[in-house]
Design a protein with these regions (language model features):
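P-loop NTP-binding core
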Residues: 1-200
């Protein structure tokens, strides 16, 4: 099972769209695919047609993760997100045990798991990064985008160097690209200069 976090500390960059489209694309190739909505806003759940009645928070109440999974109309399974993830964020913050997500998924049989993370570096995001084999970073070509991506890459490197994860940065996905826009070209040029091996 390959666990992939879709993450960026900035909101509005296309994380949810990327996560949902990847889940749908992989499911369409007959790979057993799970999408985890780790954002309390629950947009990935809504986009997948999942009800926000059960989330990963329920695992802290003793429920097995397999009881919480729903099947979307797009052939992939969904572990929905909702406002109760705020309580999970607090629980993870106060729990010294890391990798709650990976432990919860251990007995499941999926080829790929995609995690749509919140647009901030909180305990939910950190646990997703620790639990994942790799991270895809959606990035909108706009001002200050390089600062945010550098911060996230540094965080992943710190977690890896401290032995908490083997997370590798799988790549940077440019989203909402408008080739007529000079700013898009400038940011793309900078990305190709600083992260040539990571760009999609």
């Amino acid at each position: 099972m390959k666990i992939i976090a879709i993450s960026n500390q900035k909101g509005g960059v296309g994380k949810t769209t990327t996560a949902v489209n990847l889940a749908q694309a992989f499911a369409a190739t007959n790979r057993r695919t799970l999408l985890i909505d780790l954002d309390p806003q629950g947009n990935a759940s809504t986009a997948s047609g999942a009800k926000k009645i059960k989330s990963l928070f329920d695992t802290t109440l003793g429920r097995h993760v397999s009881e919480l999974i729903q099947t979307s109309s797009n052939q992939y399974d969904v572990l929905a997100g909702g406002e109760d993830l705020v309580a999970l964020e607090v629980a993870l913050r106060n729990n010294p045990t890391k990798g709650h997500i990976a432990k919860s998924l251990k007995e499941l049989n999926y080829d790929f798991v995609f995690i749509d993370t919140p647009p901030s570096l909180n305990s939910l995001t950190l646990d997703a990064l620790i639990s994942s084999d790799g991270t895809l970073i959606p990035l909108q070509c706009e001002y200050y985008s390089l600062e945010g991506i550098t911060s996230l890459i540094n965080t992943i490197n710190e977690l890896t160097n401290s032995g908490l994860t083997n997370n590798k940065i799988f790549g940077i996905i440019r989203t909402m690209v408008d080739k007529r826009n000079n700013l898009t070209k400038d940011v793309s040029d900078d990305l190709e200069k600083y992260f040539p091996k990571l760009l999609f």
